[in-house]
Amino acid sequence: MTENGPAPQRSGSAQNMLTIGTAPDSWGVWFADDPAQTPWQRFLDEVAESGYTWIELGPYGYLPTDPAHLADELKARGLRVSAGTVFTAFHRGGEQGETAWEPARKVAELTAAMGGEHIVVIPAMWRDDVTGEAVESGTLDEGQWSDLFAGHNRLGAVLAADFGLKQQFHPHADSHVGAQPDIERLLAETDPDLLNLCLDTGHAEYCGASSLDLIRRYPERIGYLHLKQINPEILARVRAENMTWAAANLAGVMSEPPGGLPDLREVIEAVEGLNRPIFGIVEQDMYPVGFDVPMPIAQRTRNYLLSCGSRTTVR
């Protein structure tokens, strides 16, 4: 591993710049424990069988949390960890720093123990996924923005100092940071040494942001990628009916590549042009899903993405 991601490898005369991995999300996993989800052993088996090497931890508690146990399970399948995931609500101020830290510490400890170098940080959503009711305003006032920026700078500093991990902020549907102006404001008001983007191409498209524009205008702030696509016809329906993120997924808003938007060939070309190693983790949001559905999609997506770039690998 290097400071910014996977160690570059050589294929002929060119360095590999984008390393493709996958995540529990692509197997329909949103929660630590849910009988509707693929069992973790089957997930790991199918990831390896599908030809991937790198994975994310997914929701804390889905995979074994004992480092020795998890390390043995990964080694047996030739798998490695790129990142863990935490959730925050710093815009709410008050005790949110303390509230976020305990779960973040657990994820950071496990991620670092597995050799990962990144923590993907997802902001709280402003409406309930089940009922669709707003749990708070969908917009932030100036004080809330300030709390959000300060909280993430503090989190990034602790992750770096205590665990050697990099904070990759994940703009998210139904959160306060999803649209392009909000992403740009976040980048302007946070320390690039403490926070960069986990650019999720599907969430960006869903929220009306341009992945290509963000890569081209903020190349130094692209720290990590989630690769996915959106079905534009279903997205139009989602917007017309004001669906929640969960309802949109049930409606099929996520599209198996290459059938949706954005054009991942263009995204991968732009990312390879950054000329530094970076992870691109495949995410196919489809909770809940039958156990036999994810692996064929994961295999087809892997093969497609590897065809998109001249310096893209799974190793």
Can you say where each PLM-predicted feature lies in the sequence?
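N-terminal pre-domain/capping segments
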Residues: 2-118, 142, 153, 196, ...
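Active-site acidic/histidine proton-transfer and metal-coordination neighborhood
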Residues: 3-10, 96-197
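Acidic/histidine-rich catalytic cores of soluble enzymes
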Residues: 22, 54-55, 150-257, 261, ...
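Active-site beta-loop-alpha junctions enriched in small/polar residues
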Residues: 23-27, 58-60, 86-91, 124-126, ...
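Short, flexible, mixed-charge acidic loops at enzyme active sites
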Residues: 34-38, 125-134, 235-247
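Residues at the N-termini of beta-strands
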Residues: 54, 118, 224, 278-279
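A short, acidic, amphipathic alpha-helical segment used as a generic capping/interface helix at domain edges
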Residues: 258-273
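A short, acidic, flexible beta-alpha connecting loop/helix-capping segment that sits on the rim
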Residues: 281-296
